[in-house]
Amino acid sequence: MYIQVLGSAAGGGFPQWNCNCVNCKGYRDGTLRATARTQSSIALSDDGVHWVLCNASPDIRAQLQAFAPMQPARALRDTGINAIVLLDSQIDHTTGLLSLREGCPHQVWCTDMVHQDLTTGFPLFNMLSHWNGGLQWNRIELEGSFVIEACPNLKFTPFPLRSAAPPYSPHRFDPHPGDNLGLLVEDTRTGGKLFYAPGLGQVDGKLLAMMHDADCLLVDGTLWEDDEMQRRGVGTRTGREMGHLAQNGPGGMLEVLDGFSRQRKVLIHINNTNPILDEDSPERAEVLRRGVEVAFDGMSIEL
C-alpha cells in the first residue's frame, strides 16, 4: 500500500492566512524553524498509479501539483484520482471537491450523515450535478468493509468516531453515528494495515483493538494541550469540545500511543497553534523521544 500525505495541517493550514500567533508570526519572520503545511488530506494506492483521495482539502490544487502521480498524462485530460472517500463533511475536508469539478464525474464514498450534510447545509452534490454528472454517491455502511474498484487490493473498514458534525450541520449538537469516520485500510496482498483517524476525540477499547491490528497509526495531532486555543488567545473551545484528543497530559494521545511498540506512529491534522510545529521546541523533542513522527506535506509511507 502506498500512502501519500498531501496535506498535514488542520483547518486553515500553517501558517494560517489571518493568524499572528507565536507559530504563524514566527514562521513568517524567520524566527521559528518550521515547515509550512497545507490542510489535511491523504491519498492511497495499491499500485502507485490508481489513487483514492481521502478528504478533499481546500488546498487540493496545490497538493495535486506537488505530487507527480496525480497527473499521469495518459490523455489530453487525466488524473490519478480514481475515487474519493470523505471521512466527514467538514468544510476543510470537502471544499476541495469544488476545485475538482473539471474532472467530474467523481466516485465519492461517504456515509448517509455526510451525504445529508452535503446535500442540504453545504450542498456540494447538488451544486456539482451540473458538471458532467457531478459526484456519484457510494454509500459507506457502518458495518463491514468495502472495496473500491480502482484499487481492488485495498480493503476499507470504516469505524464511527465520537466527534461533532460541522458548525453548519443541522445536527451539530445532535451527533449521529456516521458524522465522523476513521478507516482501517488493509492491503490484501502485503497484509499491511493503516489506521487513519485525523479527527479522534476519544479512544475506547474497540478502537485500541483496531490500532493494535494495524502497522501504521496515522492519527489526530491537532492540539498539544486541550485548552490550547484559549491559551493562545485564538479561541474559546477546548480540543475535546471540537472532537480532538490533545497530545499532552494523562489520557492524551501520546499516552495512548505509548501502548504501541510495533506500529509506526504518525501525527497528522496539526493545528497552527500546536508547539510541535516548532522543530526546536521541547514539545517536538518530547514527541520524537516517544517514538512518534510528525507528518509533513509530501510524506510517503509504504506498507
From Swiss-Prot:
Keywords: PQQ biosynthesis, Transport. Pathway: Cofactor biosynthesis; pyrroloquinoline quinone biosynthesis. Signal peptide: none annotated. It holds the Pfam family Lactamase_B_2. GO terms for biological process: pyrroloquinoline quinone biosynthetic process. CDD domains: PQQB-like_MBL-fold. May be involved in the transport of PQQ or its precursor to the periplasm. PANTHER family: COENZYME PQQ SYNTHESIS PROTEIN B, HYDROLASE C777.06C-RELATED-RELATED. Belongs to the PqqB family. This is Coenzyme PQQ synthesis protein B. It comes from Pseudomonas putida (strain GB-1).
